[in-house]
Amino acid sequence: MKRTFQPKKRHRARVHGFRARMSTSNGRKVLARRRQKGRKALSA
């Protein structure tokens, strides 16, 4: 059986990356929450 997670750097960045988060208002809210929480890494 094939595993479901087949990692690709480009897809990860495009879907979950910083610029993807910044491109929508809700994504900016995500980053704000993670900054407030004190996350070391804000996005993928």
UniProtKB/Swiss-Prot annotation:
InterPro entries attached to this UniProt entry: Ribosomal_bL34, Ribosomal_bL34_CS
Basic residues bias: start-end ranges: 30-44
GO biological process: translation
UniProt key word Ribosomal protein: yes
rRNA-binding among keywords: no
Keyword list, A-Z: Ribonucleoprotein, Ribosomal protein
Region annotated Disordered, chain positions: 21-44
GO molecular function, one term: structural constituent of ribosome
An example Gene Ontology CC term for this record: ribosome
Record-linked NCBIfam families: rpmH_bact
Assigned protein family: Belongs to the bacterial ribosomal protein bL34 family.
Name used for this protein in its record: Large ribosomal subunit protein bL34
UniProt lineage: Bacteria, Bacillati, Bacillota, Bacilli, Lactobacillales
